[in-house]
């Protein structure tokens, strides 16, 4: 429980760093393990950092022996869907082989509490909305498949081994720490909210909307945006749940509220008071028109209730991106 050391793998990244903040606030000792290929050293502010790669078993063994964590939170992964189609081998090497190496090291060290960052991309194209955890899992790209393979491995580790896990399937993570210490910072950026904010700030030539003829209330895609601090809270609750002996479980993390791209852009204009050019272009292959979570199970199992709405997501993201010293 509180006071325990937690190894946060990928803890220098966007969601991992916000989770370190929440862990520290709740009395845990987060130790970041990161190769800093996508993470940021300046995001490691709430505990020590150990540099290393999840494919390096000897380095993992060394770090686990040194810090003796009670649980592992695993965020480290390649995440860009488009890149996964161009270079699937890297995604399998990092997301599958890397995770299996981490799991082997964890088992050898006697760690049996593991929280895994998964994704709603494991569901593939939704057959019904909102999606609950019983929805079939038929991922449609290599990124989603790598996460699904790890989910299956974790189920086997639970059934035939001694490792219990909480699999957290995120919907659209967004927003930033309200004190502006950390926020979303990807290179290159592909997520809608930072791209639209950059357009409002004049840092890019407007914003492109992929598809305006979907069967949704205004023709644009619907997504479930969840504040990164709500995600962080769910991860800390998942650690507590496992350390108290909870059984392995997979949970959706979303608000249950869908927002269209047009609604999102309108909300960003309202917060920023800066109109920006929007271009409507053709649909993007593989995009689902609606992805919204049923989050009842996370509420039941973890007592988790999202605290922040879309306006708070956008306000915190705006404050972060508008800081002139950011990147």
UniProtKB/Swiss-Prot annotation:
A single GO BP: polysaccharide biosynthetic process
Keywords recorded for this protein, A-Z: Carbohydrate metabolism, Exopolysaccharide synthesis, Galactose metabolism, Isomerase, NAD
Location of the active site: 143
Coiled coil location: none
Residues reported to bind substrate: 119
Cross-referenced Gene3D superfamilies: NAD(P)-binding Rossmann-like Domain, UDP-galactose 4-epimerase, domain 1
Reactions catalysed: UDP-alpha-D-glucose = UDP-alpha-D-galactose
Cofactor(s) listed: NAD(+)
Pathway(s) it belongs to: Carbohydrate metabolism; galactose metabolism; Glycan metabolism; exopolysaccharide biosynthesis
Signal peptide, first to last residue: none
Gene Ontology MF terms in the entry: UDP-glucose 4-epimerase activity
EC code: 5.1.3.2
Pfam families the record matches: GDP_Man_Dehyd (PF16363)
Record keyword NADP present: no
The family this protein is said to belong to: Belongs to the NAD(P)-dependent epimerase/dehydratase family.
Protein name in the entry: UDP-glucose 4-epimerase
Gene name for this UniProt entry: exoB
């Amino acid at each position: 429980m509180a006071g325990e050391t937690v190894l946060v793998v990928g803890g220098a990244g966007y969601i991992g760093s916000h989770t370190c903040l929440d862990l520290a606030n709740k009395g845990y000792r987060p130790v970041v393990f990161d190769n800093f290929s996508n993470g940021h050293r300046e995001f490691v502010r709430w505990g020590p950092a150990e540099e290393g790669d999840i494919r390096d078993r000897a380095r993992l063994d060394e770090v686990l022996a040194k810090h003796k964590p009670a649980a592992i939170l695993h965020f480290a992964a390649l995440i860009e869907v488009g890149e996964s189609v161009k270079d699937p081998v890297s995604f399998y090497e990092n997301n599958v082989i890397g995770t299996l190496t981490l799991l082997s090291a964890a088992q050898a060290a006697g760690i049996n509490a593991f929280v895994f960052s998964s994704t709603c991309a494991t569901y593939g194209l939704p057959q019904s909305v909102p999606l609950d955890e019983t929805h079939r899992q038929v991922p449609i790209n290599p990124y989603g498949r790598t996460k699904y393979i790890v989910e299956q491995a974790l189920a086997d580790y639970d059934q035939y081994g001694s490792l219990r896990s909480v699999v957290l399937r995120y919907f659209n993570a967004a927003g930033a720490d309200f004190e502006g210490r950390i926020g979303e910072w990807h290179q290159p950026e592909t997520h809608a909210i930072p791209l639209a904010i950059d357009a409002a700030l004049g840092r890019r030539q407007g914003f492109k909307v992929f598809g305006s003829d979907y069967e949704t209330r205004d023709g644009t895609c619907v997504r479930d945006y969840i504040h990164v601090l709500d995600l962080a809270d769910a991860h800390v609750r998942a650690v507590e749940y496992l350390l108290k002996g909870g059984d392995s479980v997979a949970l959706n993390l979303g608000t249950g509220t869908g927002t269209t791209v047009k609604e999102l852009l309108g909300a960003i204009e309202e917060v920023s008071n800066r109109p920006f050019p929007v271009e409507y272009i053709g649909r993007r292959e593989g995009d689902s028109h609606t992805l919204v979570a049923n989050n009842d199970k996370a509420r039941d199992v973890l007592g988790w209730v999202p605290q922040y709405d879309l306006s708070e997501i956008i306000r915190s993201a705006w404050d972060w991106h508008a800081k002139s010293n950011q990147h």
